[in-house]
Amino acid sequence: MKKVVKYLISLILAIIIVLFVQTFVIVGHVIPNNDMSPTLNKGDRVIVNKIKVTFNQLNNGDIITYRRGNEIYTSRIIAKPGQSMAFRQGQLYRDDRPVDASYAKNRKIKDFSLRNFKELDGDIIPPNNFVVLNDQDNNKHDSRQFGLIDKKDIIGNVSLRYYPFSKWTVQFKS
């Protein structure tokens, strides 16, 4: 009988730990489409880190997952609260300076700026809001369609791709 009780206690503790980790630390996610290709492809399995959101550690270039209605999307942060941003002739400008990152140059996006957002009064991103963009220019499931992404809708940043094994990646570089 003591073995059964010990087993049940161990099982309950394991379930509590798993629930805690999935609620506050990390969660698994399957990439549902090719919006972030070639960085992430449909069917890739990733770990989403929730801690960076909790402690306001999200950075430009981070790939995040976020909720929009009942759907979960994956995009890249291109501008954070307190910054301005614009695309001019395929080049991303942040705070009126060109961004030197692979995701920011030679894009098929000609002219796109904060002025495209109806919900925004000025040229600066308000607190707790982000501008996100997919790596695929023709897939507009990002700020071009949704507008600003509120921090409360962000699940976390993609910090590890564990499948397919041949593409194992930790911390995606911009």
From Swiss-Prot:
Q: Which gene encodes it?
A: spsA
Output the Gene Ontology terms for molecular function.
Answer: serine-type endopeptidase activity
How would you describe this protein's topology in the membrane?
A: Single-pass type II membrane protein
Query: Among the record's GO biological process terms, what is one?
Result: signal peptide processing
Please state which protein family the record places this protein in. Belongs to the peptidase S26 family.
Q: Which residues form the signal peptide?
A: none
Q: Does the keyword DNA-binding apply?
A: no
GO CC, one annotated term: plasma membrane
Cystine pairs annotated here are none
Q: What is this protein called?
A: Inactive signal peptidase IA
Location of the protein in the cell: Cell membrane
Arranged from A to Z, the UniProt key words for this protein are: Cell membrane, Membrane, Transmembrane, Transmembrane helix
Task: Write down the InterPro entries for this protein, in alphabetical order.
Answer: LexA/Signal_pep-like_sf (IPR036286), Pept_S26A_signal_pept_1 (IPR000223), Peptidase_S26 (IPR019533)
> Which stretches are Extracellular in the membrane topology?
29-174
- Species name: Staphylococcus aureus (strain COL)
Gene3D superfamilies reported in the protein's UniProt record: Umud Fragment, subunit A
Function of this protein?
A: Catalytically inactive.
Please list the residue ranges that the record places on the Cytoplasmic side of the membrane. 1-7
Name the major location.
membrane
Going by the entry's taxonomy, the superkingdom of the source organism is recorded as Bacteria
Which spans are transmembrane here?
8-28
